[in-house]
């Protein structure tokens, strides 16, 4: 299985640079797994494809305003820091620009004295471990001085931070949004519940590795980055009970899929727990839990495109993507959505 098997031509103008005005008015392509049929709808029409007894599983991770700008105390030189992962109470794994000048022991100032940072170590991938200190709670200060770490393909500044958060985001820790969830409004979620569909949340903190392209030609040699996940006993019980009653498990986003498939046993039961997952799902993988997926349109040659190809078939997905290009769907984080059922 070669990397080139997951390539497609995407005109740059189809990469969405900003969210549409109303979350649930984005377009929705329906891809049927068992028949050769696609449909073109509006996201709000998702309701028509859900049945009483189904369970919709969402990732309630919240994006941190993880990009902070500061300066070196010693020289006043400007510096940019991107928070990747919390290691301990005060220490974070980060990426620093310019990295070559970020030496161990260097003291950094952010927000005109609101936060200080000390570089204490290097990381395996060329980053830095920074120990932060501030008078107010760390996350509170971060909200004041940080900006959203938008993906590199989005060039337009974000005017409203909340548009890069899902309406149900609860647990801070992601460096990128679980973007399939951006289409849901509180009103649509209420309509889904009223239809007899359960909504269950799990947690997977999205790392920046989600944007890293696969760089090996032999796909099976690719290694995923680790991400923290958590499934509560209550969430596992609700999902397992729904399956026992014959309900379908439909994941919202590839992060929810990775969380569920990591936490399941061979019988397809979801087990509660937490830890780090580097599960890599590509064609040939046998899904144990999910039967459907709400997802966005992904980058060529990406691990996310491979995951949805594992669910619906590579040829079917690439054919659907060609349709999406022809029909001028909007791609990537702020783009349109696909339902695979």
Curated annotation (Swiss-Prot):
Cellular localisation: Cytoplasm
High-level lineage: Bacteria, Bacillati, Bacillota, Clostridia, Eubacteriales
Pathway: tRNA modification; tRNA-queuosine biosynthesis
Chief site of localization: cytoplasm
InterPro entries cross-referenced by the UniProt entry: QueA, QueA_dom1, QueA_dom2, QueA_sf
Known EC number: 2.4.99.17
Catalytic reaction(s) noted: 7-aminomethyl-7-carbaguanosine(34) in tRNA + S-adenosyl-L-methionine = epoxyqueuosine(34) in tRNA + adenine + L-methionine + 2 H(+)
Keyword Transmembrane helix included in the entry's annotation: no
Record-linked NCBIfam families: PRK00147.1 (NF001140), queA (TIGR00113)
Record-given protein name: S-adenosylmethionine:tRNA ribosyltransferase-isomerase
A Pfam family recorded for this sequence: Queuosine_synth
Record-level GO cellular component terms: cytoplasm
Keyword Cell cycle in annotation: no
Reported function: Transfers and isomerizes the ribose moiety from AdoMet to the 7-aminomethyl group of 7-deazaguanine (preQ1-tRNA) to give epoxyqueuosine (oQ-tRNA).
């Amino acid at each position: 299985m070669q990397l080139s098997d997951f390539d497609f031509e995407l005109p740059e103008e189809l990469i969405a640079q900003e969210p549409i005005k109303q979350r649930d008015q984005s377009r929705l392509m329906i891809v049927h797994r068992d028949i050769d049929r696609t449909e073109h709808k509006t996201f709000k029409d998702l309701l028509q494809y859900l049945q009483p007894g189904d369970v919709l599983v969402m990732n309630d991770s919240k994006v941190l305003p993880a990009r902070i700008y500061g300066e070196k105390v010693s020289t006043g030189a400007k510096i940019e820091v991107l928070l990747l992962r919390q290691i301990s109470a005060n220490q974070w794994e980060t990426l620093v620009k310019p990295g070559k000048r970020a030496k161990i022991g260097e003291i950094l100032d952010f927000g005109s004295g609101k936060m200080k940072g000390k570089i204490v170590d290097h990381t395996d991938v060329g980053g830095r471990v920074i120990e932060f200190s501030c008078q107010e709670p760390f996350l509170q200060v971060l909200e004041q001085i940080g900006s959203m770490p938008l993906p590199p393909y989005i060039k337009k500044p974000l005017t409203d931070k909340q548009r890069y958060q899902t309406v149900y985001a609860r647990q801070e820790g992601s460096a990128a949004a679980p973007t399939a969830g951006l289409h849901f409004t509180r009103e649509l979620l209420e309509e889904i519940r009223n239809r007899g569909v359960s909504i269950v949340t799990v947690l997977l903190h999205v790392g920046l590795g989600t944007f890293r392209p696969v760089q090996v030609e032999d796909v099976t040699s690719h290694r995923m980055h680790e991400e923290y996940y958590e499934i509560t006993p209550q969430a596992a019980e609700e999902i397992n009970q729904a399956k026992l009653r014959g309900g379908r498990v439909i994941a919202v986003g590839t992060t929810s899929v990775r969380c569920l498939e990591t936490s399941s046993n061979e019988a397809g039961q979801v087990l509660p727990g937490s830890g780090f997952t580097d599960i890599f799902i590509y064609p040939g993988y046998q899904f144990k839990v999910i039967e459907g997926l709400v997802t966005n349109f992904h980058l060529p040659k990406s691990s996310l495109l491979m995951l949805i190809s594992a669910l619906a078939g590579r040829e079917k997905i690439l054919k659907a993507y060609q349709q999406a290009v022809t029909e001028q769907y909007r791609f990537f984080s702020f783009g349109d959505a696909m339902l695979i059922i």
